[in-house]
């Protein structure tokens, strides 16, 4: 039995980057031997075990064969006679197909170290084209390592185009696609992910509503620079689409509720946000009501951040509308409902009276 660190842990150590998760590969062992040593089985499709003390994942060396469409269309074979090289060749990129033994010796049968030095994302074997999820994974790695100067190798991009043209991307579930998009959105340069998808034809397959123009991606780029959370980045990406298109994208990818809500509200209200300084008090109140700023102030704040990121992406140096709207929201929230309740108002009458008082507060705010 031989145990190796594999994949990202080896890659990131060689790049001098922090190593978070470690994947372990076991060569020359049987399921029975792993169980006898106290490892706990967790793999549904192939033998993966949890270490009895650390809880880290240890997988038996395996080969795989294409047996159907999509990400899950593979048959796996794990046995003690599967070699290290046979296991590594099934991996996506050469930089992910390196292993390191307990003595620190790196095994690199497919020139991953050479590609690290060349800053190349290159596939290991032609079998790369059998897994459509790899198109998204490579684009995500391109986004992650763009600051280090990495690019997708021409021959790998050609295979990605082949996958996109084959229709195999349609076999990906919404959950798998969203998981990769979500991870890509949180990379340092998420706009690179969408540029790579566009370059290989995958963007048109997965997100035909989008393009890779600088304006489309500029707000997202700004959101990443300012380290904004996922739902803000998602809304920034979709900010140029119509509400109808935003709804279609959200439903197709089954985006999380928080992402869906902010993206939809942005699509519906971005124009009003940009015109805030000219809005009459009635329109201002309607905007605040739409966001329910009285009970959900953070959602409105997130919207203002999206507006600001979009303005920065469009080349604006500042966005005074944001502070103007924050002060307007504070003025509306400051209205005290108690006197109205004490006056005996209830139900719809109370709601209308409260709305009227908030309108007066906004008019007073606008008068200065």
Swiss-Prot record:
CTP binds at residues 8, 11, 91, 137, 140. Mg(2+) binds at residues 21, 23. Its EC number is 2.7.7.72. Signal peptide: none annotated. The keyword Magnesium applies. Keywords: ATP-binding, Magnesium, Metal-binding, Nucleotide-binding, Nucleotidyltransferase, RNA repair, RNA-binding, Transferase, tRNA processing. One of its GO terms (molecular function) is ATP binding. SUPFAM superfamilies: Nucleotidyltransferase, Poly A polymerase C-terminal region-like. Its cofactor is Mg(2+). Belongs to the tRNA nucleotidyltransferase/poly(A) polymerase family. Bacterial CCA-adding enzyme type 2 subfamily. A single active site specifically recognizes both ATP and CTP and is responsible for their addition. Catalyzes the addition and repair of the essential 3'-terminal CCA sequence in tRNAs without using a nucleic acid template. Adds these three nucleotides in the order of C, C, and A to the tRNA nucleotide-73, using CTP and ATP as substrates and producing inorganic pyrophosphate. tRNA 3'-terminal CCA addition is required both for tRNA processing and repair. Also involved in tRNA surveillance by mediating tandem CCA addition to generate a CCACCA at the 3' terminus of unstable tRNAs. While stable tRNAs receive only 3'-terminal CCA, unstable tRNAs are marked with CCACCA and rapidly degraded. This is CCA-adding enzyme.
């Amino acid at each position: 039995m031989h145990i190796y660190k594999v994949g990202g842990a080896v890659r990131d150590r060689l790049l001098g980057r922090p190593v978070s998760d470690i994947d372990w590969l076991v060569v020359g062992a049987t399921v029975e031997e792993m169980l006898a040593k106290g490892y706990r089985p967790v793999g549904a499709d192939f033998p993966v075990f949890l270490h009895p003390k650390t809880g880290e994942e240890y997988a038996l060396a395996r080969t795989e064969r294409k047996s159907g469409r999509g990400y899950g269309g593979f048959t796996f074979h794990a046995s003690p006679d599967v070699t290290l090289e046979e296991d590594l060749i099934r991996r996506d990129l050469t930089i992910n197909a390196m292993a390191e033994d307990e003595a620190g010796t790196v095994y690199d049968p497919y020139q991953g170290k050479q590609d690290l030095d060349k800053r190349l994302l290159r596939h290991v074997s032609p079998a790369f084209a059998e897994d459509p999820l790899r198109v998204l994974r490579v684009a995500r790695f391109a986004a992650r390592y763009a600051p280090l100067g990495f690019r997708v190798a021409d021959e790998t991009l050609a295979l990605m185009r082949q996958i996109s043209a084959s229709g195999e991307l349609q076999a990906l579930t919404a959950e798998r696609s969203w998981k990769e998009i979500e991870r890509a959105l949180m990379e340092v340069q998420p706009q690179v992910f969408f540029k790579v998808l566009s370059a290989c034809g995958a963007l048109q397959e997965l997100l035909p509503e989008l393009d890779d123009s600088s304006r489309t991606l500029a707000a997202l780029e700004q959101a990443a620079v300012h380290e904004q959370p996922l739902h803000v980045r998602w809304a920034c990406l979709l900010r140029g689409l119509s509400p109808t298109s935003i709804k279609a994208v959200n439903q197709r990818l089954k985006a999380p509720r928080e992402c869906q809500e902010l993206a939809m509200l942005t699509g519906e209200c971005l124009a009003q946000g940009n015109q805030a300084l000219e809005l009459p008090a009635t329109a201002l109140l309607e905007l605040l009501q739409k966001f329910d700023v009285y009970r959900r102030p953070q959602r409105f704040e997130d919207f203002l951040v999206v507006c600001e990121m979009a303005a920065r992406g469009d080349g604006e140096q500042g966005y005074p509308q944001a502070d103007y709207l924050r002060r307007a929201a504070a003025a509306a929230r400051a209205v005290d409902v108690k006197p109205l309740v004490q006056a005996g108002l209830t139900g719809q009458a109370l709601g209308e009276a409260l709305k009227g008082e908030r309108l007066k507060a906004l008019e007073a705010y606008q008068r200065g």
